[in-house]
Amino acid sequence: MLLPKRVKYRRQHRPKTTGRSKGGNYVTFGEYGLQATTTSWITSRQIESARIAMTRFMKRGGKVWIKIFPHTPYTQKPLEVRMGAGKGAVEGWIAVAKPGRILFEIAGVNEEVAREALRLASHKLPVKTKFVKREELGGETNES
C-alpha cells in the first residue's frame, strides 16, 4: 500500500473537498487515462485494489502509472470512547480526488483493453470517472 516515508506532523486537519483539481489534469505519461468527475477521498487500499484489477486484466502487459498519492493521514477514535482527550490515532492515508484529476494512466495496450482495464479499476474507487485519451485532453506528445 502507498504511504509517505516520513511526515512533518502525524495528524492533520481534513482536506478541502470543494472546487476542481488545480494540477494533474492531463494525460502526460501514458496514452489513456482515468479522470475523476466527482470529489471524494481515496484511500491507499482503494488505489492498490484498482491497480491490481487493472494489471490482472492486462495480464501484466503494458505499463500503468498511478497519478495520485495518499499523503494525508486520517484519524479515528476507538468505539465507545467519550469526547475529548485529544485527536484519535492515525487510521490510514487518503488522497483527495477532485473533478478533472487524472487518477491512472495506461500505455502499451490497445484501446479496447485499456478501456476495460480502467472500467474495472473504476469499480474499486469511490469517485465517478471517465475514460480519456491523450489527444482529447491535449497532453504532451513524445515525438522527436
Curated annotation (Swiss-Prot):
Ordered alphabetically, the record's keywords are: Ribonucleoprotein, Ribosomal protein, RNA-binding, rRNA-binding, tRNA-binding
Bilayer-crossing residues are none
List the InterPro entries hit by this protein, alphabetically: Ribosomal_uL16 (IPR047873), Ribosomal_uL16_bact-type (IPR000114), Ribosomal_uL16_CS (IPR020798), Ribosomal_uL16_dom (IPR016180), Ribosomal_uL16_sf (IPR036920)
Question: Please, which domain of life does this record's source organism belong to?
Answer: Bacteria
Comp. bias intervals (Basic residues) = 1-19
Task: Extract the GO molecular function terms from the UniProt entry.
Answer: rRNA binding; structural constituent of ribosome; tRNA binding
Respond yes or no to whether keyword Protein biosynthesis is given for this record: no
The record, for PROSITE patterns, names: RIBOSOMAL_L16_1, RIBOSOMAL_L16_2
GO process terms (BP): translation
- Which cellular component appears as one GO term in the record? cytosolic large ribosomal subunit
Mind telling me which Pfam families this protein's record contains? Ribosomal_L16 (PF00252)
Q: Does the keyword Ribosomal protein apply?
A: yes
Q: Where is this region: Disordered?
A: 1-23
Q: How does it assemble?
A: Part of the 50S ribosomal subunit.
Q: Which family does it belong to?
A: Belongs to the universal ribosomal protein uL16 family.
What is the annotated role of this protein in its UniProt record? Answer: Binds 23S rRNA and is also seen to make contacts with the A and possibly P site tRNAs.
Q: Which NCBIfam families match?
A: rplP_bact
Q: What is this protein called?
A: Large ribosomal subunit protein uL16
